[in-house]
Each structure stands twice: as C-alpha cells, then as structure tokens.
C-alpha cells in the first residue's frame, strides 16, 4: 500500500464505483486518470503531485483545448483520491496540494448556454419535413419544458412518474449522494402531452417507460452508454437546427440552462429555480445564471449614458 501510485489509487476507487454500479462516476474517474496520465505519464507517484505540478498540468490541458469545466472535474476526482490516500496513511497530510494558499481548483465560468425565448420559439417551430429531426427536436423541447430534465432521467421516466398532471422524479445524479433527495415536480404542458402521444410508448402498466429508448433490461453501464448514444444523436440533429435557424449554440445541455434563464428573465426567484432544477444549494443555481448576471451588468452599464430616460 505504501508504494501506491496514482494509477493504482484510481483503479482501487474505480473498482469500488464499478461494484456499486456508479457508472457515470466510474467513467468520470476513468477520464480523469487518462487526462492526468497524458500529462504526467503512467504510474505517477502520489508525492510527485505538488502545487507546481498541478499548475503545469492545468497549463498543459489548456494548451490542448480543455475547458475549465473539464479541468475542474478532473482535479476534483484527483482531490478525492489524495484525500483517501491521506486517510489510509499512504500520503502525508503536509503533501496535500489542494486548498487555500495552495492550488485552488478553477471553477467553470458562466458560458452563454441559455437561449432567448425568440430562439426557443425557432426550435419549437422548426420543421424540415424529416421525422428524424422532428423526433430529436421534440426530445429537446420536452427536456426544456420538464424543468430542464437531464437525458439520464428523461429516457428512464416511467408512467408511475406521472402524478396529478405532473412529472415527479428524483435526479439520478443526486439520488445516491443527497441525504434527503429532492423530488422535482414539473407540470405537464399540452406540448409535453403531444410529445408523449407522438413518440412515447402506450401505457401498459405504471412501470412502462414513457419513451421508447430503454427496455428495462439495462445494467448501470448499459444505461450510461444508451444515454450517451441518444445524446450524441440528438446533438447532431440539434446542430443542423442551429445552423438553419442562426442559433449560435444548441445542445441537449442548453435546455437546462434555458429553462433556468428564461424563468429568471421573467422574474422568478432564484430559490424557486433552484428547487425546480433539483439543485442542492443556491450556489449551483447561481453558476447556471452567471451569464444572465452579465447581461444585467451590460444593460445597467448602458443606462449610465442613456440620456433618453
């Protein structure tokens, strides 16, 4: 155990994740290890990971086109690995490189991911005569209207999740970690009912999946692979819609940000938006709304020389 290196430490953690069927987290750690080894080589001694090493690693990743969001994910995984090594007596606490006055993990900046209502109208009304585009456009619309539901949750919704005209679900992302998982409630709008009737499975029993993509036999890793496949297909179609409508960026992820930002622009309280998204705290929601805050600053700055007021 004393000779444990980064590769073996990650593999130990990944085995636990695999045994617990935490597929998404497993794949996230796998990606982090691959990226760390692309900089530092294989079998990196834990003691080699210093503040300077982390700074050089960050610069290396940025030069390769990695985003700060990705860097943050990789380093959070590494931080957990090193914390575990300290707890197990493998690494001295004084060697821990993260924290105040050491290396601080960068936060993903608030990128403009949300669409305006005008752009959302373009998406919802877009037609090119093909069922292929129509299906994945409708999936995006459903995600947007259903509180920005993540595709991991959307594809595995069952008819039992429909209660009194609402879709009620717990986010798979937080169901394992949160002590008291928050149930999200999304009113089913007429547009959502139309999408269910158009693309959904007929209701056989409460456990019937609303949509046709899953069959219930998938294990944890197959579920993740299924979601990634559908998301990839959806994003390809969304890219075509964006190109043909003049929308700068349209992906499955923009549905969630658009839901939050449209409500904020309409005057909804951040606490309500946070609850609707199923966030654990307001700080997470505020990060979603970071670009909205920039828009506010731009408008307010323009007021300073608006002599027509």
Please place each PLM-identified region on the residue numbering:
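Basic, Lys/Arg- and aromatic-enriched nucleic-acid-binding interface segment
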Residues: 98-108, 113-151, 155
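Active-site/catalytic core of tyrosine-dependent DNA strand-transfer enzymes
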Residues: 120, 189-247
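Short, polar N-cap/turn motifs at the start of nucleic acid-interacting alpha helices
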Residues: 161-166, 247-249, 268-287
């Amino acid at each position: 155990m004393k000779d444990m290196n980064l590769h073996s430490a990650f593999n130990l953690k990944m085995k636990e994740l695999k045994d617990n069927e935490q597929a998404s987290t497993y794949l996230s750690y796998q990606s982090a290890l691959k990226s760390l080894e692309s900089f530092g080589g294989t079998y990196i001694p834990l003691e080699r990971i210093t503040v300077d090493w982390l700074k050089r690693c960050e610069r290396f990743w940025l030069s390769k086109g990695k985003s700060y969001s990705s860097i943050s994910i990789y380093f959070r995984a590494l931080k957990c690995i090193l914390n575990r090594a300290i707890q197990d007596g493998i690494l001295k606490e004084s060697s821990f490189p993260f924290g105040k006055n050491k290396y601080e993990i960068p936060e993903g900046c608030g990128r403009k991911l949300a669409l305006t209502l005008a752009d959302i109208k373009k998406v919802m009304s877009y037609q090119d005569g093909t069922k292929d585009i129509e299906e994945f456009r409708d999936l995006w619309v459903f995600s947007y209207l259903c509180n920005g539901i993540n595709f991991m949750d959307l594809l595995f919704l069952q008819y039992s999740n429909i209660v009194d005209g609402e879709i009620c679900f717990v986010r798979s992302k937080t169901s394992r970690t949160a002590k008291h998982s928050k149930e999200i409630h999304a009113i089913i709008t007429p547009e959502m009912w139309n999408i269910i009737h158009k693309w959904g499975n007929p209701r056989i029993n409460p456990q019937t999946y609303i949509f046709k993509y899953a069959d219930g036999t998938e294990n944890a890793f197959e579920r993740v692979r299924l979601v990634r496949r559908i998301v990839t297909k959806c994003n390809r179609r969304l890219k075509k819609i964006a190109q043909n409508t003049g929308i700068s960026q349209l992906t499955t992820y923009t549905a969630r940000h658009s839901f939050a930002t449209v409500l904020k622009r309409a005057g909804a309280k951040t606490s309500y938006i946070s609850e609707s998204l199923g966030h654990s705290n307001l700080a997470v929601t505020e990060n979603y709304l970071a670009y909205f805050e920039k828009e506010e600053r731009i408008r307010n700055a323009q007021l300073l020389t608006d002599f027509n007021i």
